[in-house]
């Protein structure tokens, strides 16, 4: 049972209320008004304008080429279509290198219609998170596999196994202590993601992090089974195949997240 009336717009405080009520959060990426409107009307709680647009919209091999101007353009397009879902937008590569740069980029994104900005990593990013939150800008943290760090990681690999899992737990608590209102966990083994989700006071959103998170997110192209030109990750499921239409696929995805049937073991990583 939902603790949030379907007709009510989502707010940042409502996310924490959903966690306390045990209500799973449904998130998808979107990059234009048409898809965003469809997602908003069919049960999606949060829309992410991700820098993944560099790969699925622009054809790059990574997210590194995406600029703040790109993010502002797509954020504004999506924002015009939303009535209910809460809009989150990524800070692009190195836009959060310093607190001042992050404030400039985040201000542009909020002026374009975003209600929260997403920042990858912990470490020196903790200062950035605190700086933004102190200036009334809601922040979503992104931990685990952080795509902007692909060169350092040597590819898109599972993060948080073994001793790295303990560091991930510490990082997750640190970003919340710095003021993050939401934490995305990407490509993290199910046991550690479940443990982190239980420990944090704010919701976690998983992508390849198992069913123990407080919600799930997928890139829309992956959820619809579209060929992005890249190898399909283990955690991806084609909901268009069973939904029969884009709207049907979104409803099937939302229902599967809420009833806990997605992700299952086939779409998650073991310890």
UniProtKB/Swiss-Prot annotation:
GO terms for biological process: pantothenate biosynthetic process. Binds 1 Mg(2+) ion per subunit. InterPro entries: Pantoate_hydroxy_MeTrfase (IPR003700), Pyrv/PenolPyrv_kinase-like_dom (IPR015813), Pyrv_kinase-like_dom_sf (IPR040442). It holds the Pfam family Pantoate_transf. It catalyses: 3-methyl-2-oxobutanoate + (6R)-5,10-methylene-5,6,7,8-tetrahydrofolate + H2O = 2-dehydropantoate + (6S)-5,6,7,8-tetrahydrofolate. It is found in: Cytoplasm. Keywords: Cytoplasm, Magnesium, Metal-binding, Pantothenate biosynthesis, Transferase. 3-methyl-2-oxobutanoate binds at residues 51-52, 90, 118. The keyword Membrane does not apply. Mg(2+) binds at residues 51, 90, 120. Its main location: cytoplasm. Catalyzes the reversible reaction in which hydroxymethyl group from 5,10-methylenetetrahydrofolate is transferred onto alpha-ketoisovalerate to form ketopantoate. Belongs to the PanB family. HAMAP family: PanB. This is 3-methyl-2-oxobutanoate hydroxymethyltransferase. The gene is panB.
């Amino acid at each position: 049972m939902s603790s949030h009336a379907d007709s009510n717009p989502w707010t940042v405080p409502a996310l924490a209320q959903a966690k306390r009520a045990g209500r799973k959060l449904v998130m998808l990426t979107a990059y234009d008004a048409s898809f965003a409107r469809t997602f908003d009307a069919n049960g999606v709680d949060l829309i992410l304008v991700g820098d993944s647009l560099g790969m699925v919209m622009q054809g790059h091999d990574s997210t590194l080429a995406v600029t703040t101007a790109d993010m502002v353009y797509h954020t504004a397009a999506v924002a015009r279509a939303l009535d209910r879902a809460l809009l989150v937008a990524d800070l692009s590569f190195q836009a959060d290198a310093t607190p001042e740069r992050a404030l400039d980029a985040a201000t542009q994104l909020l002026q374009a219609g975003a209600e929260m900005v997403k920042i990858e990593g912990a470490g020196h990013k903790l200062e950035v998170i605190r700086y933004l939150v102190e200036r009334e800008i809601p922040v979503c943290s992104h931990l685990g596999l952080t795509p902007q760090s692909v060169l350092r990681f040597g590819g898109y690999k599972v993060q948080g196994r073994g001793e790295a899992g303990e560091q991930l737990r510490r990082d997750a608590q640190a970003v919340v202590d710095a003021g993050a209102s939401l934490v995305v966990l990407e490509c993290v083994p199910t046991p550690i993601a479940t443990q982190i989700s239980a420990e944090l006071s704010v919701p976690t959103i998983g992508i390849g992090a198992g069913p123990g998170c407080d919600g799930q997110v997928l890139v829309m192209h992956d959820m619809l089974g579209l060929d992005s030109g890249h190898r399909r990750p283990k955690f991806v499921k084609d909901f268009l195949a069973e939904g029969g239409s884009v709207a049907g696929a979104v409803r099937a995805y939302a229902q599967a997240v809420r009833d806990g049937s997605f992700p299952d073991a086939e779409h998650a990583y073991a310890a």
